[in-house]
Structures are given as structure tokens and as C-alpha cells.
């Protein structure tokens, strides 16, 4: 299980400072939509200069198939290690993205977003007319069949996804509150024990790390646990 630290701070300077504090730790960094829009692709280069961190660019790409493939191709030129697209974009979009990325000698891992961890059952059903678990199983089967590397899901769907695909089909699980911290805007949250029991491959932790007075110590504690 790998730790992915979410760089969701208010400024680029704060993100870079956090990154410097975490230098030499065996972690991934997650760059989200706000940071990428604010700081651009040069921010990725700056992160790579701090240390040889693996970068997950969390843009949740969702558009028509050709536009998605174009976007993923451009992102791949930046040396990104992992990206994500929305599973609800469908199998044609998935196929176009994977075909386009196949020309790279070292392409990024591509994950599909299933049900955002900010959803509870009621709100999810109001949009998709399905229970979360049913939709996630369907999304994961389509993603697996069309060559993606894994899924973004809550901890509670991770094991189910592997049961309906393969054990090596990756799961990245946001909404991790490692030591029982408050949920904030997340609905389907879990701790480290739950993540381990449900076979998560990557856990995403943000606020419990960067809001702490000693982010490095928290990261080290998490790494010891996993």
C-alpha cells in the first residue's frame, strides 16, 4: 500500500514547503485541479526538482472521447506517473485514451473515477439511479475490460472491485482519515486498518497531514502503519 499526499493547500508556496518537509519519504504526491489551474505545468517541474516523487495528477478528465485522449496525451508529455478519467465517460473514451497513450514508451497509470467519496447513497442515487456498489462494480468491469490500470473509489468498494476484476487491478482510495480525524466534506471515509483490510493499493491523505504542526512526523507514522 502506497501513501499519496494531497497537495491541496492555498498557495503554491505552501505546497512546495510541504513537499520539502517530506523529502526522501517513500510517498506519491497528488496535484489536484485547483493547484494545476493556479500553478500550471511548471509546478510539476518544481515538485520533481525537490525530490524524485511520483506524481498523480488528479484532474478527473471527462469530455468527449477525442478531447479526453488529447488531454491525456498532453498530460503524459509532462512525465506524470498517474492520471484519472471519469468512468462515466464510457468505454469508447477509455479505448481512445489508452490507444493514444500506447505510443509512449512509459505511459502514466490510468485510473477511472467511480463514485466520488463526497457522495452518500441518497445523493448518488438521485443522479445515477443506482446504488453506489452496483455502479462501482459496473464501472470497474468496463474499465478493466478496456485496459485501464485501476479505479478511484472509496475503501468500502476496493475489495469488491478486485473480486469482480483481478487482484492486481489497482485501487486508489481517497477519504482516508488515518487516526480518526474529522470527515470534513467526505462522506465515505475510512482509517488505515480498513484500507489494509479492503486491499487498497494507494491511500490519499491530505488535511490530516498538511494541517498538522508536524506533517513529516504524521507521514512517517502512516508509513510505519502501512
Swiss-Prot record:
Substrate binds at residues 8, 30, 58-67, 117, 177, 186, 206-207. Pathway: Pyrimidine metabolism; UMP biosynthesis via de novo pathway; UMP from orotate: step 2/2. Coiled coil: none annotated. The active site is at 60 (proton donor). GO terms for biological process: 'de novo' pyrimidine nucleobase biosynthetic process; 'de novo' UMP biosynthetic process. It is an enzyme of class 4 (lyase). It comes from the Bacteria. Belongs to the OMP decarboxylase family. Type 1 subfamily. Catalyzes the decarboxylation of orotidine 5'-monophosphate (OMP) to uridine 5'-monophosphate (UMP). Homodimer. This is Orotidine 5'-phosphate decarboxylase. It comes from Campylobacter jejuni subsp. doylei (strain ATCC BAA-1458 / RM4099 / 269.97).
